[in-house]
């Protein structure tokens, strides 16, 4: 009985622990995003689907770009002065929202032109950037709650998002909605309404601090942002190039990209969680972390291969057009994202050891390499899987180089024995 009680207590503790709640909440959010991606070919007409899925993919990408630097910066600095850095965080996030709303007011803004999401209607353009702003509301609120260890609040917020999105998908399917604005309003804005309330509450509660250290906070955040933007943009080069050549293939690539949402969310989740825990001054915690990541390797890659096999089989049988080609694109995307997620468990420590300048250089070289490959290798719809695989291999190679750089830096510091 005593053993049974201990086992039950341990399971209960694991299930209600901070990391478990965090993983569950973010997996649920990823599931809601994945369902939008997976069901949209079947609940939307072909023309509406190809337009929507490309824009939706870019909304998710813009969310990553605008949020990539601020949340890690907050998690790194929060432990030093909670009051001051909460103030800086909310101030910066407010500026981000203002920039997005401003972009929404200009149909011919350069960002839309680069991403090939320019609309003829001001209302459609505005609702795209409003969707990005509401999505970022969730990301920024989650970052603040993570710093405050309020994981139950994160879970409640994501359950609300999940339920509203499911209802929205049912209504879109049942009513055969084709209006672009209404679709985005249903799946990208209304589900995050509560996040706007949470943000306003945080702003009203914050104690405003002097801005004497805001420059250092901002510089660190800008460095992380540039690193993240380069990485995210590198992944988009092939998609944007494809959009200019073949809209159907661009839709297929956007669909494939949507399937890796759970890995991307898991990556963000793990990075956010561990950035708040890892400290360069604590040798034991760094060594323990590296040991855990190493032990995790075999099981992780076995699971990744199983998932890739299952996804290939499912897509091959359900995707409405060019199923074989789309299935292979999905597998390549999953492998690339899955491998980079694991490598990223090492490379995230560039922030812990302040190696951002070196990572910035590597990401810049990676961006340039992919740009050259995409620009000068003739595009062929017949060999799109091979071309996409080559681009993915280049990205993985540079991420490996960043991880290697981090491990070499740790070894050179002679803080951890045996590396």
Question: What kind of feature is each model-predicted range?
Answer:
Residues 2-14, 117-123, 152-156, 176-188, ...:
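Interhelical loop/hinge segments that connect adjacent transmembrane helices in multipass membrane
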Residues 17-29, 55-109, 123-125, 283-308:
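Membrane-water interface segments that mark the loop-to-transmembrane alpha-helix transition
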Residues 37, 64-81, 260-284, 351-352:
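Helix-loop junctions and terminal segments of transmembrane helices
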Residues 77, 133-156, 335-362:
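Membrane-interface junctions at transmembrane-helix termini in multi-pass inner-membrane proteins
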Residues 18-33, 37, 160-161, 183-202, ...:
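Transmembrane helical elements of multi-pass membrane transporters/channels
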Residues 49-57, 125, 247-262, 327-330:
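Small-residue hotspots at the loop-to-helix junctions and early N-terminal turns
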């Amino acid at each position: 009985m005593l053993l049974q009680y201990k086992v039950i207590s341990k399971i209960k503790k694991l299930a209600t622990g901070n990391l478990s709640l965090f993983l569950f909440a973010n997996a649920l959010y990823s599931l809601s995003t994945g369902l939008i991606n997976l069901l949209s070919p079947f609940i939307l007409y072909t023309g509406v689907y190809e337009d929507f899925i490309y824009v939706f993919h870019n909304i998710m990408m813009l969310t990553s770009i605008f949020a990539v630097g601020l949340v890690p910066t907050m998690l790194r600095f929060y432990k030093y002065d909670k009051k001051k850095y909460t103030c800086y965080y909310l101030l910066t996030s407010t500026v981000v929202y203002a920039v997005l709303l401003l972009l929404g007011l200009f149909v011919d803004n350069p960002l839309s032109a680069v991403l090939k999401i320019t609309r003829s209607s001001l209302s459609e353009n505005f609702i795209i950037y409003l969707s990005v702003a509401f999505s970022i509301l969730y990301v920024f609120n989650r970052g603040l709650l993570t710093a405050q260890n309020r994981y139950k609040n994160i879970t409640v917020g994501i359950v609300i998002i999940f339920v509203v999105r499911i209802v929205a998908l049912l209504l879109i399917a049942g009513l055969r909605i084709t209006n672009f604005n209404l679709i985005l309003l249903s799946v990208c804005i209304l589900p995050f309404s509560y996040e706007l309330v949470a943000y306003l509450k945080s702003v009203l509660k914050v104690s405003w601090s002097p801005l004497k250290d805001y420059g250092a906070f901002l510089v660190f955040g800008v460095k992380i942002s540039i690193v993240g933007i380069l990485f995210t943009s590198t992944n988009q080069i092939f998609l944007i190039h494809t959009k200019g050549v073949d809209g159907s293939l661009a839709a297929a690539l956007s669909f494939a990209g949507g399937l890796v949402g759970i890995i991307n969310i898991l990556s963000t989740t793990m990075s956010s969680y561990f950035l708040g825990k890892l400290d360069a001054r604590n040798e034991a915690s760094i060594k323990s972390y590296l040991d855990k990541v190493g032990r995790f390797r075999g099981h992780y890659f076995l699971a990744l291969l199983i998932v890739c096999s299952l996804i290939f089989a499912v897509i091959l049988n359900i995707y409405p057009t060019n199923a074989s080609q789309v299935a292979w694109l999905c597998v390549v995307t999953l492998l690339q994202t899955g491998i980079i997620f694991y490598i990223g468990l090492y490379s995230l420590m560039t922030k812990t050891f302040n190696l951002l300048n070196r990572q910035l250089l590597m990401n810049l070289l990676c961006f340039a390499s992919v740009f050259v490959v995409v620009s000068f290798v003739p595009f062929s719809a017949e060999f799109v899987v091979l071309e996409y695989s080559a681009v993915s291999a280049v990205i993985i190679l540079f991420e490996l180089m960043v991880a290697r750089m981090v491990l070499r830096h740790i070894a050179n510091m002679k803080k951890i024995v045996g590396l």
